[in-house]
Amino acid sequence: MIKVVNLTKRFGDHEAVSSLSFTINKGEIYGIVGPDGAGKSTLLRLMSTILEPDEGSVRINDVNVYDHPYAIKENLAYMPQKFGLYEDLTVEENIHFFGRLFGLSRSEIKKREKRLYEFSRLAPFKDRLAGNLSGGMKQKLGLACCLVHSPEILLLDEPTNGVDPVSRREFWKILYELLADGVTIVVSTAYLDEAERCNRVAMMFDGRFITWGSPQKIKNSMNGIFVELITTNPLMSEMLLKNVSDFKGIILTGQSLRLFVDDIQEATLFMTSILEKHEIDILSIKEKLPSLEDCFVDIVVRGA
């Protein structure tokens, strides 16, 4: 449904998006995951035709979006990080306003309103000013405004950034409902736990995809054994072990340390020889299933 080929965008000497090529299938949630500055927002702006690339192409349903930008507008919706709601208009007025922008008649908007209120749970607040909504409710309203013209493809740029955990879960529940309706969703996020919810994920760093696939495929493709290490001094242990090239990808989570090793027994002996010099004991080391965050950190560190 979406085919991206050698997509590149430069700002001066900085290459924000570097020769990306990938495809997105109809009816899937495709996650673009990475830290701030990775190039996620630039990529979505390119895909939505807000920006034009220096090189490469994006094709939607075999139509080049840069040659025929208006041909794909009715099938596409893009929600930026800060969606332009009119805060002095009510929830209902915002939906009607964006519906008219998309060329819908008042009767068409009225027909679609019920469904928009159903999935967004905003019906009780339709007469409330948008400026008086919570952050999570504003995001739901922004999504409703994007969907008023019933697009086939939805591009979402960090839609849950700065939103409380409960609202994040509710937002993802809405996305799954849209997925069940056949909408193709491309979502960028800095939250790696959210990436676990996607059908497929591309991890982005410094304008490039460093790995991609289903969350499980990415985890299965990692080299080494993932372990959880508990010591008598986790903070000092992290500082000491990070100085060793084999353990640069170590992550301190609560009171435990998480990392990939080639061999548990050899790694235990090596770490013990380092830590015991500082009177730190290893209490346990156990094999665990890695998260996408564990994989991302290890890939970035090993590639550094």
Regions found by a protein language model. Give the residues of each.
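Conserved ABC transporter NBD signature motif
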Residues: 56-67, 71-72
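Conserved ABC ATPase signature
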Residues: 88, 129-133
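Conserved catalytic motifs of ABC-family nucleotide-binding domains
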Residues: 150
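ABC ATPase "signature
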Residues: 212-213
